[in-house]
Amino acid sequence: MAEPATDTILVLNGPNLNMLGTREPEKYGHATLADVEALCRETAASFGLKADCRQSNREGELIDFIHEAHARKMKGIIINAGGYSHTSIALHDALLAVQIPTVEVHVTNIHARESFRHHSYTARAAFASLCGFGIEGYRLAIQGLAAKLGLKPKA
C-alpha cells in the first residue's frame, strides 16, 4: 500500500518539459525544470503543503503517477501534460477517475499558437487552466488550488 500523503500535491510535467531552459527559449524562457520544481515546492510550502514533482515523456507513466496520487490521498494535482494535453483522452480519463482537484498549466499561451494546440483534453478534467504566464503559471496554479482547498498562506 502506498504511503498516505494527505499534505501533498502532485506537480506533473509531461513530454519535453525536461528540456525547459534549452528548448526554444524564445517561447519557453530560460528557466529549467529544476527551477519550476523549486518554485512549486516553495509555493506549496507557503500553504503548508509538500509538492511531489514528477516528469515523464511517457503517457502511461504519467497515468501511473495520477493513480498513485489517488492511492496516496494527495490533496491536488498541477499538470502540464505538454503535447499530451492536445491528444490524450487517457490522461483526461485518469484525471476524472481519481477525482482530485486539478489545475492545468502551460508555460506558453496555447491559444496563440498552432491551431492543433488550441484544444486541451486535460483542461476538460481540471477545475482551472492557466497558460501564457511562463513558469509563474505554476505559482498561480498552486495558489488557485490552495484557495479551492480553503488553505491560507502560512505566516
From Swiss-Prot:
Enzyme class label: lyase
Origin superkingdom: Bacteria
Pfam families (UniProt xref): DHquinase_II
Pathway assigned to this chain's UniProt record: Metabolic intermediate biosynthesis; chorismate biosynthesis; chorismate from D-erythrose 4-phosphate and phosphoenolpyruvate: step 3/7
HAMAP family: AroQ
Binding site residues for substrate: N80, H86, D93, V107, T108, R117
Family listed: Belongs to the type-II 3-dehydroquinase family.
Cited SUPFAM superfamilies: Type II 3-dehydroquinate dehydratase
UniProt catalytic activity: 3-dehydroquinate = 3-dehydroshikimate + H2O
Job of this protein: Catalyzes a trans-dehydration via an enolate intermediate.
Residues forming the catalytic site: Y28, H106
PROSITE patterns linked to this entry: DEHYDROQUINASE_II
Cystines in this chain: none
InterPro entries: DHquinase_II, DHquinase_II_CS, DHquinase_II_sf
Higher taxonomy: Bacteria, Pseudomonadati, Pseudomonadota, Alphaproteobacteria, Hyphomicrobiales
Name recorded for this polypeptide: 3-dehydroquinate dehydratase 1
Entry-linked Gene3D superfamilies: Dehydroquinase, class II
Site (Transition state stabilizer): R23
One GO MF term attached to the UniProt entry: 3-dehydroquinate dehydratase activity
